[in-house]
Amino acid sequence: MSSKNCESEGLFGTIKVGIGAGLVAGCALFSSFLSIDQQLNIPHGTFYKTIGIPMGVEGFGAVLIGLLMHITVAALIGIAFNISASYWRTFRIVTVPKGILTGAVTGAIVFSLAFLPLHTMVMMPILETTLSSPDSVVSILPEEKEALLELIKGNDFVLWYSAMLHVLFGSVLGLMSGFLLHDRYRNVPRIRSIW
């Protein structure tokens, strides 16, 4: 099912589209990730600290590390999504609705194959160990510790909310990719008008 990518922009143009679409989708959902904290009644940025603290960073630096990691991964997912879509005819984004649909599927795949294992088998155990260990490398304030323990307690909510946000991220990624790639596939014959 593979076909050759013979577009004039080539691979570099596809990578640029992937970076742009991934960054837009990642930034569009930034406030939604902060709403996880609001839903659990914990200080803003606590969810992002679950990435920074296991890396040995504390305080506001942990929030920044978490944010930068999310944005970087969003750009990488955008690149992988657009390269895959340009090389496999089945996934080629010839219309915006097809981009949204394939993006939503991509978001579900990213959640199940990347986020879920990393969150449950790597980040949460490291965070729990850091919080329970008296000789931790990271010094966590009592308020931060209480908020992080509340986040761990609400882990089921975090997982369901994250699943929804990953599908939404993928939909926005597909939407932006469809907008950016519209001219490239203008003359491609359509199946049932949108596919």
Where would I find each of the regions flagged by the language model?
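Juxtamembrane/disordered regions of integral membrane proteins
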Residues: S2-W195
